[in-house]
Amino acid sequence: MLFAFCCGAIVANIYYAQPIIELIAPDIGLTPALASLIVSLTQIGYALGLFFLVPLGDLLENRKLMIITNLVAIASLLGAAFAEQPNVFLLVSLLIGFSSVSVQILIPLAAHLAPAESRGRVVGSIMGGLLLGILLARPVSSLVADHFGWRAMFMAAAAVMVFISAVLMLTIPKRQPDHSASYGQLLGSLGTLLRKQPLLRQRAFYQGCMFATFSLFW
């Protein structure tokens, strides 16, 4: 349950801005035509994090990597909360998405730590927390922004990330992956897997379509 909460709270950072863009844009001097860049850059940052940051989970000590990533998220959320210029807000939006991929390091780590007989249940619970975080982020953001202003939402999110970082530091044991490949080789292996595994391509296509459909709705 603890890991499920952490994953849900971390991934929610990607979606907090979406329902309150109409409040953010005029306050930071962003034109309506460019306001959608907030959402786009956050998602682009997440995609970049998946490609460039998550593979480091096979090279670096996992707990340390997650804490550093969370610290970047905290700084980015605070940057969003205090941003006065559109360029600054767009930059930290990219970083918020980039640093939110720590959930994709936490999930396999939790699977590694769980007993074999309960591994599926543990991963399922964590994924449930992740999806719940996505679903609740928008109404929570709207509620907080309506009562306290949109900047308060990012301050609150930063505070939650501080709490999560402390919890992870205290509860997760260190794990140094036993992997001999270099970072470049790991990045290259992503293309190799996609090329040699037709089932992976099929599942990736399905998931991409599902995410696109969900994004259109939510």
Which ranges hold each PLM region?
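Pair of pore-lining "gating" transmembrane helices in MFS-fold secondary transporters
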Residues: 1-16, 196-213
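Conserved MFS/SLC helix-loop-helix module at the cytosolic interface between two early adjacent transmembrane helices
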Residues: 48-86
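Short hydrophobic/alpha-helical segments at membrane-entry points of transmembrane helices
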Residues: 87-93, 202-203
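Cytoplasmic helix-loop-helix junction between adjacent transmembrane helices
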Residues: 92-129
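Helix-loop-helix hairpin linking two adjacent transmembrane segments in secondary transporters
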Residues: 124-172
